[in-house]
Structure formats: structure tokens, C-alpha cells
Amino acid sequence: KLTEFKDDYLRLTNHWSFNDYIGFEVGLVSHQRKAVVESFYKLFNYPSKYVSVAPAVALELLPWGKKGSIFKIDYEKGWKNLLGSNIDYERVEADAQTIFQASRRQSYSIRLGAGFYTRKGDHWDFVDYTNFHDDNIPGGWNDSWSGEFELLPSQWYNASDYYIRGNFTYEAPMIATAWLPLIGKYIEAERLYVSSLVVNHLHPYTEWGYGVTTRAITLGIFAAFKNTKFNGIGCRFGFELFRDW
């Protein structure tokens, strides 16, 4: 626990939709990270609290309206000494998300994005990238795991001065498990997940996953690879009982 921090996150945003095709955001983003064991940092004359306060603007483009793809560009600039901030930085991120319906029950979910710092002051690695918090797709993804990295700790990308990402999900009523006797009749949808990320020290990080949805639950299993080497496996679980409420 010596190197752990408690993170208080605040984001205030005002969003304008000029029409169905263009949106604009202005807001303020703040992180306050406080060391769990403050005495450890004071012993070495390091700050035990890191605060960032950044005005942020974003432009959204929806070329085919609110039921289609969305492209978003985010810009943040953190000012040192603004409302107690001790971190200054400047960052740009771009994100594109879409769901392509091949048929009524078959779809492809795609997310592509990149981000980088144009200015890095002291302690800049105590700031989070925006597009690993937000999902911009109108109406949301078809499930909780599309467009995300399930097994990767956030410090890998937040401590990098750049990232390039891609997330892909294929959904269909019958891929593998639905063909099996006895249990196949309970499967409503199956999904294949492929995600990739390039950051400092990971060239690349990839996740491969498979998920099934029944009327009651959703189950997923994911395998992670760091620089092409197997890094672990994990499972995810979700309830579907109240999906249609």
C-alpha cells in the first residue's frame, strides 16, 4: 500500500447539440490523488497529494445522425496553481465508434482511438486519459465489454505519453456454444472480442475474448497478451434479468 493513492475524480461538462450531426462540449476535469500512506512520501520529501484541474473542450461529429457512427476530438489543458492544481499538461485525443448491423441479430462493434500529450509538466503521469472513461456511441454498446480492455490495469495507459487503440466485437445468435445440445437452446447471443493497444512498453497489448448471453446472465472469458506473450486469463459476469425493464 505504500505506493497506492486514493483518487477523487470530478468532471463538469456542458454539452450542446447544434443539430443531429454536430455537438460541442465545454467543461472542467479534476483529479485529486492522495497517498494512502502519506508519511512514506513525506519521508523522502515527495508530495503526498497530486491535483490536476483542466479546462476541456470537445467536438462531436455524427455524419449519419444520432443512430450512426460518432467521431470525437477532445482537448484538455491543465494549469498549475489553478484551484490548487500542482500538475500542468496539454493533451489531445481522438475517438471513433460505430455499430454496423449486418442483420437484425448480427452486428459488428468497432472502436478506434488515439491520444498524446503536447505538453508534459511535473507529475503529468498522475492524469487519466478521457477516452478510457467515456463511451460516446449513441445508445451505448450492445453489451458491457465492447470497446473496453477487461484485463489491463489502467496505469499501463495512463502513464504513457501516447496510445493507439482498437476494439472489435462480432455478435451473432449462433457462433459456437449455441450449436451444442442441451445448453444451446438457452443461448440468446454469442460474441467474439478482439482488442489491441499500443503504449509505452507495450507493442502491442492484445485481448481475445468470447462471451455468451442468456435471458438471465452474460458470461465472458478473456485472454491477455503483452508484447505477444501470454499474460493471463480472466472471466466476467453480468445479470440480464432486468434488461428489458
Regions found by a protein language model. Name each.
Residues 1, 64-177:
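C-terminal outer-membrane beta-barrel translocator/porin domains of Gram-negative envelope proteins
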Residues 1-17, 31-46, 110-153, 221-245:
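Outer-membrane beta-barrel translocator/channel fold
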Residues 178-187:
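Short helix/loop segment immediately N-terminal to the Walker
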Residues 20-26, 34, 62-69, 102-108, ...:
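Repeated loop/turn-to-beta-strand initiation elements of outer-membrane beta-barrel proteins
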Residues 12-16, 28, 57-61, 94-98, ...:
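Residues on the lipid-exposed face of transmembrane beta-strands in outer-membrane beta-barrel proteins
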